[in-house]
């Protein structure tokens, strides 16, 4: 592993431990050249995924892009980072275990919306407004109507 401080490849693992849900291994490392300490995370990747965009272009799946888009939807919402990370892991696992190497962006969007709907209504509506390309207030009314029809609490779900 390359040291982020000096760029040396001469690093050593000082501590390894699984995260709470055991889907990721956290490693504390030290650079033997400059003594800089840093943390890395290791997770299992079942398969390389390719995303088929709406315009037909194919791009490699980017987990970080998924995290960023969810962080935007969840901004200023009472959802802990741990819950976000767990949801991302669940989504990625579902995509990887689908058996498909190529996955449409629409499929990813639907899976994300399904997970957000169970987690936080406000984040769900925010994500839906971008994903479904809302153009007018009526679009918001439709989604809000769907949520109230479910009869579920309209805040953060436990």
UniProtKB/Swiss-Prot annotation:
It holds the Pfam family Zn_ribbon_NrdR. InterPro entries: ATP-cone_dom (IPR005144), NrdR-like_N (IPR055173), RNR_NrdR-like (IPR003796). The gene is nrdR. The keyword ATP-binding applies. NCBIfam families: transcriptional regulator NrdR. GO terms for molecular function: ATP binding; DNA binding; zinc ion binding. Binds 1 zinc ion. Its cofactor is Zn(2+). The keyword Transferase does not apply. Keywords: ATP-binding, DNA-binding, Metal-binding, Nucleotide-binding, Repressor, Transcription, Transcription regulation, Zinc, Zinc-finger. Residues 1-20 are annotated as: Disordered. Residues 49-139 form the ATP-cone domain. Belongs to the NrdR family. A zinc finger (unnamed) spans 3-34. One of its GO terms (biological process) is negative regulation of DNA-templated transcription. This is Transcriptional repressor NrdR. It comes from the Bacteria. Negatively regulates transcription of bacterial ribonucleotide reductase nrd genes and operons by binding to NrdR-boxes. It comes from Afipia carboxidovorans (strain ATCC 49405 / DSM 1227 / KCTC 32145 / OM5) (Oligotropha carboxidovorans). HAMAP family: NrdR. Coiled coil: none annotated.
